[in-house]
C-alpha cells in the first residue's frame, strides 16, 4: 500500500507534495537536482495569452520570516507553453496543474480552453488574484460574485477539473470559498500571498519597484492554517494547502487543518531538494504518529470535536 497516495478530482497523486506555481518555473532548473517524477504533481508558472515580461526590478525583497515578490506574472505566453514547456515536461511521470491568469475574463477563458487540452495537463489552477482591467483594476479574487462568474466561465470551456486559488487579501475567505464552490469549482488551492511592503531606511523609498508585493514563507503559515481550518469546514470540495511549508511536520499540520494535498513555494528557493526530502520524511513521521495512511490526517483537528471559527477577542 502506498501510504502517501491521494486521489483528487483529475489527479491521482503518488504523494501529496507538489511545488507551488511561481516558485518552480516549468521545472527545468530543478530537474538538474532530482527526477521530477518523484513529485505528486507540478503546478507550473502562471500562463497568460501573450508573453509578459513582468514588473521592473527590484522585484524581490527578503523579510525576517520569508520574502516579498512583485514578479508581475512573467511568462513566455500560451503558445510557447503549449509548444515547448508542456512537451518537455511530458518526459516525467507526473501530472501537471496549469496555472491560468489574465487581465480580462475573456483572456482567462481563452487560455483555459487551449491549455486544458494538453495531454499532460490534468487540472487547472485559476489565479484569481490578478487585477481586472475592465473593473478598475480590482482583483478578480476580492469580490465573490466576480470570482464565481469567472469560475463558471472557465468551467464551461475547460476539459479538466478546475481548482481556484484563493487570495487571503479578503474580508471573509469562507464567503469567497462558498461562492466559488457554488459556481462549480472542483477544488481550491490556498493561500496565495499576502500584500506587504518594505521601505529602505537609508532612502525612505520602497524597496520594490512596484512598491508592494506578495509576502510568502514561514511568516504566513499560521494565517494559511487558520484559513484552511475555516474553509475546509464550510465546503465539500478538496483543498490543496500552501503557505510557508518547510517540513513534513508542516505538511501534517496542513492536513490536520483540512488540506488534502499541499504545495511548497518559497522553501524551494532555500533548498532545491525540499520537495523530495519531505516526501521521504513523511512515512517516518506517520510511523511516529501511529498513522497508517496520510488521508487519515485530513481535518483531524476539527473532525474529532466541534466545528469552530474564531470570531475575534
UniProtKB/Swiss-Prot annotation:
Q: Which residues bind substrate?
A: 45, 69-73, 127, 192-193
Q: Which residues form the active site?
A: 130 (nucleophile)
For this chain's record, the cofactor binding note is:
Binds 1 FMN per subunit.
Database matches in InterPro entries: Aldolase_TIM, DHO_dehydrogenase, DHOD_1B, Dihydroorotate_DH_1, Dihydroorotate_DH_1_2, Dihydroorotate_DH_cat, Dihydroorotate_DH_CS, Dihydroorotate_DH_I
- The record lists FMN as bound by 21, 45-46, 99, 127, 165, 191, 217, 243-244, 265-266
Q: How does it assemble?
A: Heterotetramer of 2 PyrK and 2 PyrD type B subunits.
Q: What does this protein do?
A: Catalyzes the conversion of dihydroorotate to orotate with NAD(+) as electron acceptor.
Indicate what this protein is called per its UniProt record.
Answer: Dihydroorotate dehydrogenase B (NAD(+)), catalytic subunit
Organism listed in the record: Geobacillus sp. (strain WCH70)
Q: Which gene encodes it?
A: pyrD
